[in-house]
Amino acid sequence: MKVDLNADAGESYGAFAYGHDREIFPLVSSANLACGFHGGSPGRILEAVRLAKAHGVAVGAHPGFPDLVGFGRREMALSPEEVYADVLYQIGALSAFLKAEGLPLHHVKPHGALYLKACRDRETARAIALAVKAFDPGLPLVVLPGTVYEEEARKAGLRVVLEAFPERAYLRSGQLAPRSMPGSWITDPEEAARRALRMVLEGKVEALDGGEVAVRADTLCIHGDNPNAPEVARAVREALEQAGVEVRAF
């Protein structure tokens, strides 16, 4: 049995520092790098690409809404055409850095509010999927299972990678609990590790609003900008490997 462990990186810009890139890269098998819209100055993106290269980490594009002030976590009312163009632009930007360092683009995973909007808005999901397909129809697209986002990715003929979040709480509906909801974040590394094991080995996890929810996971996400992200990533990876689960890129 195997699973990918991913984290966001390269999101710092100017005087603003986000994440724990140097501590996280040795612990994950893939990374989603900012492309300049929600975060990531050119220098920081290049630095993250070189860190990924040094640690043998697969690199994906992490396009977001054009919202540096809100770190891409505020929804924006963009048309499907705007989403398509923005995603295509950002994939291309990261690809330039990867080409310069002799690395391939491994996957695409939208960031923050763009990801969440795609999960419930079919036109946004379709625009993302078509942008990825236009750039490279062989590129995998990371999605939340059971959403219109997954459906549109499959309709576009893309390779779909199903994602789960051991340090985020789920609702019975299968959706992630809103960040504003008490208990929506799992901050204890050991609890996150326990949840990761259930997700991978049992295909389910307890829901914040009671009961359990089915989970399908090709990759597990650790949010790199959380204060204790390295500790969570380390605990999750160690628990998986001790259970005989191989951690490697999809």
From Swiss-Prot:
UniProt KW Cell division keyword: no
Keywords in alphabetical order: ATP-binding, Hydrolase, Nucleotide-binding, Plasmid
Family according to the record: Belongs to the LamB/PxpA family.
Organism: Thermus thermophilus (strain ATCC 27634 / DSM 579 / HB8)
Disulfide cysteine pairs (residue numbers): none
Molecular-function GO term, any one: ATP binding
GO biological process, one term: carbohydrate metabolic process
Subunit field text: Forms a complex composed of PxpA, PxpB and PxpC.
Record's function text: Catalyzes the cleavage of 5-oxoproline to form L-glutamate coupled to the hydrolysis of ATP to ADP and inorganic phosphate.
N-terminal signal peptide: none
Catalysed reaction, written as an equation: 5-oxo-L-proline + ATP + 2 H2O = L-glutamate + ADP + phosphate + H(+)
Protein EC: 3.5.2.9
Entry protein name: 5-oxoprolinase subunit A
